[in-house]
Amino acid sequence: MTNLEVRTAAQCVENPYLPMRMVIQRITDEVDDRTIKSFDLAFMDEEDARRFRYMPGQFCELSVFGQGEAPFGIASSPTEQGFVRFTVKKAGVVTSKLHSLKPGDIIGMRGPLGNYFPLDLMRGKDVVVIGGGFAFTTLRSLIVYLLEGGERDQYGKIIVIYGARTPGLLMYKEDLAAWEKRDDIQVVQTIDVAVPGWTKKVGFVPNVTEETAPKADNAIAVICGPPIMIRFTLPVMTKLGFQKEQIYTSLENRMKCGIGKCGRCNVGPKYVCLDGPVFSMAELAELPPEY
């Protein structure tokens, strides 16, 4: 590792291909079957730490040396100091290797990359956050930022609807429990099928959304989840009065290089990694139907 070329934040524009070295500070199992883990990373270069700035919705490329790299949405909030968190589902070569690492191991990170959630548009409005399963990662970043960014009074109601197949597949359990105790956010957790001991909602996310979401008169919605969940939730949002310009989502599949060079995430005139990953449904309606 000692001969690895180190990228500092000052070199970002000159050479976006070089990763910054990050040390794994903490690893947390997020679900009962241990297939999803959160990695809290700390900067090894103080200048990198000083200059690194990101917003909810952005992503980074994480690299395991000798194995490859892959894009991951940032799960921490800019308001959380001392670490950058990524939640990783074990699926392929890079993610499997990440899951085998331990605190103290070193990996690479490029970023932050892409755009972010429309925080300016959310000011003065109710914010509805709808998530399903593993796709709750960048939504956690958004929620923590709205609550802890020092401007909670700039937003209206914050309503979070989060669903998974079983209780054991709901991530960020400590966060969810803490949010439920607050009076400035409404958290609705739901699972697909009732199980013994579960006292919260039972039902699919689209149905729970119809029961819970506010009127669309002064609201912005952010939806992230499996494609089938989004597909059945969108008609519900339309029924509630939400226009396409009021609904945002994040596209992360197909991205590879993160900087618009490989062309893998190209859709019509857009590159998901450059023009996104956050898009309004109005923007997506103008694109070819690849997504």
Predicted regions and their residues:
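Local cysteine-cluster metal-coordination motifs and their immediate loop/turn environment
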Residues: 228, 252-277
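Non-catalytic, surface-exposed connector residues within folded enzymatic/regulatory domains
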Residues: 18, 51-54, 154, 170, ...
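FNR/FR-type flavoprotein reductase catalytic core
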Residues: 2, 93-256
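Short microdomains enriched in Cys/His and/or Lys/Arg
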Residues: 130, 279-291
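Ferredoxin-reductase
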Residues: 6-105, 164-166
